[in-house]
Regions:
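An alpha-helical support segment within catalytic cores of ATP-dependent transferases
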Residues: 9-26, 159-216
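ATP-binding glycine-rich loop module of kinase domains
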Residues: 45-79, 132-136
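Regulatory N- and C-terminal appendages and interdomain linkers associated
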Residues: 1-37, 51-54, 308-339
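Conserved short submotifs of the Hanks-type protein kinase catalytic core
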Residues: 108-120
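Short beta-strand micro-motifs within the conserved protein kinase catalytic domain, predominantly
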Residues: 95-109
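Conserved kinase catalytic-core helix
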Residues: 85-92, 119-164
Length: 339
């Protein structure tokens, strides 16, 4: 099915290429140069050749096997609208890092845009963890800082009225998550540390927090580092309005969760989080709230991980044990009142 869809996308791009790139000269070819299979979609790498050069295009084609053709059309339509909205906002403010959409391909269950060429920030973090001295050249910290600056720009460009913040609701969420994780071995001492630390941190927090468009999937895997800065290519889960700090907490938790790999230590993830948070510009009161929000995301990761269907029971048990130790360490480090 995906092969038929990409053929149709290819044909559409042949018809629209000269309108999309009026100064590129004569159209020579539109070719597929590679593809990457994902769980629910394919990413096709498309090259449009002109007399004066070439343009790279990313075509995201959703699989219809899970939710049917109508389902993938609806998903693609939502993502295409999100991408168009985000791109128009950034274009008006002369900001970069959001790919230009090249038309509405949602009837094919696809999203097509210019390609942002670069390396995922997570790959850079892993390289720094595996190669001694790699992080000493400043590239890792600079990339994390760029990610923080980009997210701050995104939230400022789409800012809305602040939302009321109720610490008791957040504490209730944490308590529920702790109960869910207790069955997998999260001990009472770690739970006490989490809840006591959270209550202490939230006692000095704000009563209103910023809101804006939120990506809901701002992770180091989705942050593409390129020569001119960073870019984000996935807008499937974006919402036009939501709590801005949710994106910040998601990023920091995703970075910290990489410590579950034995070769990725705290010195690496700490550098990334510190540089990112400094560039984002959160003050001390906001950072206290973010520490609690980050712990909520980490606990959610632990709870989700134990529900994943796994063919090998041993792998599932190993995941639970690794995450249990990691959550206990993270709680002691981040949630203790003295932290």
């Amino acid at each position: 099915m995906a092969e038929n869809v990409i053929d149709q996308i290819q044909a559409e791009l042949r018809n629209s290429a000269l309108q999309l790139y009026p100064n590129a000269g004569e159209l020579r070819n539109v070719r597929i140069v590679g593809h990457t299979p994902k769980t629910d979609h394919f990413i096709y790498d498309v090259c449009i050749d002109f007399a004066n050069g070439s343009e790279r295009v990313a075509a995201k084609v959703y699989r219809s096997s899970k939710c049917g053709q109508q389902g993938v059309r609806a998903i693609a339509k939502t993502e295409n609208e999100n991408l168009g909205y985000a791109y128009s906002v950034f274009e008006k403010k002369d900001l970069a890092g959001i790919p230009r959409p090249l038309g509405d391909f949602s009837t094919f269950g696809a999203v097509v845009s210019e390609k942002i060429s670069g390396l995922p920030l997570q790959s850079i973090i892993m390289k720094a963890a595996l190669l001694p001295g790699f992080a000493d050249h400043g590239g890792l910290v600079a990339s994390a800082r760029k990610a923080g600056e980009w997210l701050r720009s995104f939230h400022k460009a789409t800012a809305d009225m602040p939302e009321p913040f109720d610490p008791e609701v957040l504490l209730s969420d944490l308590e529920s998550l702790c109960v869910n994780c207790r069955g997998e071995g999260l001990d009472d001492a770690a739970i006490r540390t989490i809840l006591t630390g959270a209550r202490h941190l939230l006692s000095r927090g704000k009563r209103a927090l910023p809101s804006s468009a939120v990506l809901n999937d701002f992770t180091p895997l989705n942050v593409i580092v390129c020569e001119s800065g960073v870019g984000i290519t996935d807008y499937a889960r974006m919402a036009r309005r939501g709590p801005s700090f949710g994106d910040v907490a998601m990023f920091m938790a995703s970075v910290e969760a990489l410590e579950k790999y034995p070769f990725c230590n705290r010195s690496i993830t700490g550098q990334v989080q510190d540089a990112f948070l400094e560039a984002y510009g959160a003050n001390s009161s906001e950072q206290a709230i973010l520490r609690v929000l980050k712990m909520r995301v980490l606990l959610s990761m632990f709870a989700r991980g134990r529900n994943v269907k796994e063919s090998a029971v041993r792998k599932k048990v190993m995941w639970a044990n690794v995450m249990k130790r990691f959550i206990q360490q993270a709680a002691q480090r981040s949630m203790s009142p003295a932290a």
